Amino acid sequence: MKYSVGITALLATLAQGAAVMSKRDIPLDVKIQVVNNSEVKASITNSGSSSIKVVKTGSILDSADVEKSVIMAGENKVAFDGIRYQVATAGLPAEAFQIIEAGETIEVSFNVASTHDFAQGGDFDIAALGTFSVAESDSGDIFSAMAFESNHIKAHIDGTEAAKVRRSYLAKRTMVQSDCTGTRLTQTTNAINSCRSLAQRAASAAQSNSAKMNEYFKSTSSSAVNTVVTTFNRIASECNPSGGASRQYCTDQIGACSPGVIAYTVPSQSIMVNCPTFFTMPTTSNACRAQTQDNTILHEVTHLSQVKGTQDYNCYGYTCMRQLTSAQNLNHADTYTLFAQAIKVGC
């Protein structure tokens, strides 16, 4: 994607909606530095007077290869080629959380060469940008979200060394035959078929229900409507158990089913994986904002480059979705998911 601005302007645009996401003053400060060519070290400091319980899953604290940074080569954003999640918003296990005590600093490291192509090498601008989902100390349910933006740094990356890291990462992606059998096959097939119905209803509603378009996508412009309709039509085409561009798996393929993850997608490989939590969920639901098997499939399908190539922004659930900008909503997997569920239920 071509940008006419550098990283500072890009991050300002992305953060415009994210900045209002914090309903409380949650004092987490993120700083990054680059070491060993393409390794990023991040420190997250709680400068407040009380502990904060944040969701690790899908965030900069996650050990999996989720999107943790924005990288620019001049005016071009370097494409992210890692994992996109669907994360549960309620009933998360203790392992999904990180408690950051008052005054404590948590340090994490990740290698951006694993999920970005730096083969040509050169100078890059890097910053960490995202959200932390927050829960009460005695709860496994997400109740708010906090946006963060780190310092911006310039780094010179050796393409040859970065390519070695990337080759090692790609070698871990071992493709196997589909393992969806028995009840898991039945559940997955039913969910895919139901996903198609969800998408078809949503595509129709996007053209006629301006109130819902405003509520979820914050726009009723012809451009926004066209984007939403096109995306849902592509979802409907992809939600086909015997066709489509993606491969569906019922067991973890790359070790990414961490606590709280319902399913994940590797867009560059057109792989979608349903994690164990997926198979404990209902196929569908008449609850307004329920997480179900069918809308999980819909969520993951939007991540496919053939459909929309959406992002998560580590923003899950209605409360967080409402605080994004229109531009973010139009490229946000859970916005499409929540819209489709609302249209189905009529809420």
From Swiss-Prot:
Cysteines paired by S-S bonds: C180-C250, C257-C275
GO molecular function: metal ion binding; metalloendopeptidase activity
EC code: 3.4.24.39
Cofactor note: Binds 1 zinc ion per subunit.
A single cellular component GO annotation: extracellular region
One Pfam family in the UniProt entry: Peptidase_M35
Propeptide feature: residues: 20-176
Keyword Zinc: yes
Superkingdom classification of source: Eukaryota
Active site: E300
Subcellular location(s) of the protein: Secreted
Binding site for Zn(2+): H299, H303
InterPro entries documented for this protein: Fungal_M35_metalloproteases, Lys_MEP, MetalloPept_cat_dom_sf, Peptidase_M35
Family of the protein in this entry: Belongs to the peptidase M35 family.
Function of the protein: Secreted metalloproteinase that allows assimilation of proteinaceous substrates. Shows high activities on basic nuclear substrates such as histone and protamine.
Official protein name in the record: Neutral protease 2 homolog MGG_10927
Organism: Pyricularia oryzae (strain 70-15 / ATCC MYA-4617 / FGSC 8958) (Rice blast fungus)
Lineage: Eukaryota, Fungi, Dikarya, Ascomycota, Pezizomycotina
